[in-house]
């Protein structure tokens, strides 16, 4: 009987030791978006979604082990009787995988070791890790094929939250959301992009229709008691038919779900703001990359106007910019950093132009002899020093420029959470006004043209009423942080902005309720404790270990796992400093 373990790499994360680096924390926002924002930075870990999706869609019994510590992992190997052990990892974690594979060889010598994830593209991987099989692309179909199962069976979507161990200002107040993995890959073929190359420049849909996406939302929503979802897809709206069907399904069922997702700028323009608002998009990650407009996806688009329009309609924007591109020298890099900040996105990622194995950029730089091959893999994460020769910067300078870019954004626009709150309340005001105006003018939504059109029908837009309620809920989640944001603001302008946003909330939603006032006081208390801890260095908490088993499903009617295993995973109750985590 075959039995598969699917595991991520072991913790601690974000700790400098022989396997990893402090600047690689396994936290998306804190690591590379709200970096340098101290206690204002939202903290969370995203589960290894792919592992759950793969386990859900196999017939053989499978176990997922996410965020294990070394003891969890070794115990699982010793006691699990696994015939196959799959390890998913990114490039900087390859030395952890090496240690894990060595342990498997010793304690489960008959187990087949399968590697996958973005780290699987490392050239000469076999010289680092002792493994048997490698999946360099999409995993669900690869594993079905590998185990001789029916590749064409429908895809079942697992229930999973988008993040665990969530807090800001040290307070566990970030609300839950589900994750919906609609597809992987992107056809835009940007030269540096690991995703497009990993999936061979093709898009693979797991949920091809709007109905399938809606059903996955219903299932996850019921299990996790959420109405908010992250759509894991590089460019969800690039499949407009599916997005339109999703909206039709939500409208017919009276469900005004909200979504966070990724989109290229060109796609947003094609669908239009009215559609995005109606669909419930509340957070967009957009690759703006560089002022030099070197990528097709941003050419001819007024990004300043686009981002402002999104924010004015309640869609918070995370813009992503790239440092140390070929055209950057000591003057143009400052121009690009200033330009990226001038976009006034709520959040701003700075990522280094890193040649990641498997990408065209890596091949080009390898051929040109630009790669610095003696730089260890754990250092190749894009937030410290670059790992290639750049004619205008020393390695040390690249670390400093990167850090300083984040500091400049923080000093210029203040905490990201306040920017997001501002966009949510502005959006609520705008959309409420537009809904009222349209009713007055007798305008109704045309699902074909994706526009509001004058029809003489003055009936209220019932779905937009639900949408406004959902927008209000999204906005009010931020209310407890205002005072802490003001008290610990990085400068006077940021403190003023926190006050201004709090006043705008009061004018829009009325004075805070008793519950909101108590929550605000609690966040201030948490923030005080967090600020003391932060004085000793960054406060690094480790995610709890998540373990879930899928039974043998040979011959079973395909049925998604309904059990909400997310309430059962073991969490570390107390926050840990980086040093404590390292000792663990
Ligand atoms: S648009 Fe984004 S996901 Fe697509 S190839 Fe470019 S960087 Fe990658």
Q: What is the role of each PLM region?
A:
Residues 57, 103-107, 130-131, 245-253, ...:
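Alpha-helical structural signal in soluble globular domains
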Residues 2-28, 77-83, 110, 385-584:
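Radical SAM enzyme core and accessory elements
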Residues 13-16, 122-125, 241, 323-331, ...:
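Flexible glycine/acidic-rich beta-alpha junction loops that bind and position SAM and/or redox cofactors
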Residues 125-143, 273, 278-284, 335-350:
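Structural recognition of alpha->loop->beta junctions
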Residues 61, 112, 282, 316, ...:
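Residue-level detector of anion-binding/catalytic polar loops
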Residues 163-318, 323-325, 331-334, 338:
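Radical SAM [4Fe-4S] cluster-binding motif and immediate context
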């Amino acid at each position: 009987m075959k039995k598969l373990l699917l595991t991520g790499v072991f913790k601690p994360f974000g700790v400098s030791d022989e396997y990893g680096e402090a600047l690689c924390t396994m936290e998306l926002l804190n690591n590379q978006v709200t970096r340098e924002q101290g206690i204002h930075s939202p903290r969370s870990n995203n589960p290894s979604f792919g592992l759950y999706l793969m386990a859900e869609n196999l017939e053989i019994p499978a176990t997922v082990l996410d965020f294990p510590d070394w003891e969890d992992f070794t115990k699982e190997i010793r006691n699990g009787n696994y015939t196959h052990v799959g390890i998913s990892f990114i490039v900087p974690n390859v030395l952890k995988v090496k240690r894990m594979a060595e342990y498997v060889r010793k304690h489960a010598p008959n187990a087949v070791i399968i590697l996958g994830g973005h780290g699987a593209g490392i050239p000469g991987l076999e010289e680092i890790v002792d493994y048997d099989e490698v999946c360099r692309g999409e995993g669900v179909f690869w594993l079905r094929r590998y185990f001789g199962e029916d590749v064409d069976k429908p895809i079942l979507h697992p229930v999973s939250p988008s993040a665990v161990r969530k807090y800001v200002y040290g307070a566990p107040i970030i609300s839950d959301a589900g994750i919906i993995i609609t597809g992987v890959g992107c056809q835009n073929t940007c030269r540096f992009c690991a995703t497009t190359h990993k999936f061979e420049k093709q898009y693979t849909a797991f949920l091809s229709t709007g109905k399938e996406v809606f059903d996955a939302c219903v299932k996850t929503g019921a299990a996790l008691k959420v109405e908010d979802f992250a759509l894991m897809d590089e460019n969800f709206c690039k499949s407009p038919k599916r997005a339109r069907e999703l909206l039709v399904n939500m409208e017919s069922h009276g469900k005004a779900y909200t979504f966070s997702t990724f989109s290229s700028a060109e796609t947003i323009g094609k669908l239009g703001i009215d559609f995005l608002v109606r669909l419930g998009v509340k957070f967009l990650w957009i690759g703006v990359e560089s002022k030099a407009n070197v990528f097709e996806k941003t050419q001819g688009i007024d990004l300043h106007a686009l981002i402002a329009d999104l924010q004015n309609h309640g869609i918070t924007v995370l813009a992503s910019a790239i440092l140390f591109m070929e055209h950057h020298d000591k003057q143009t890099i400052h121009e690009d950093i200033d330009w990226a900040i001038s976009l006034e996105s709520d959040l701003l990622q700075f990522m280094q132009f890193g040649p990641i194995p498997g990408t065209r950029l890596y091949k080009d730089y390898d051929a040109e002899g630009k790669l610095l091959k003696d730089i260890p893999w754990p250092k190749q994460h894009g937030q410290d020093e670059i790992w290639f020769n750049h004619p205008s910067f020393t390695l040390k300078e690249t670390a400093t420029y990167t850090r300083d870019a984040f500091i400049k954004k923080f000093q210029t626009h203040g905490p990201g959470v306040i920017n997001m709150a501002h966009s949510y309340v502005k959006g609520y005001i705008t959309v409420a006004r537009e809904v009222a105006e349209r009713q007055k003018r007798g305008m109704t939504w045309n699902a074909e043209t994706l526009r509001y059109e004058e029809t003489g029908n003055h009936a209220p837009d019932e779905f937009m009423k639900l949408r406004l309620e959902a927008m209000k809920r999204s906005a009010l989640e931020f209310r407890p942080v205002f005072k802490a944001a003001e008290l610990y603001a990085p400068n006077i302008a940021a403190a003023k902005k926190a006050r201004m946003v709090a006043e705008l909330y009061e004018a829009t939603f009325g004075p805070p309720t008793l519950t909101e006032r108590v929550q605000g006081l609690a966040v201030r208390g948490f923030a005080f404790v967090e600020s003391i801890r932060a004085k000793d260095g960054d406060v690094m908490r480790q995610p709890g270990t998540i373990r879930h088993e899928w039974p043998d499903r040979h011959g079973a009617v395909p049925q998604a796992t309904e059990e909400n295993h997310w309430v059962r995973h073991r969490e570390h109750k107390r926050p840990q400093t980086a040093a404590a985590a390292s000792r663990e």
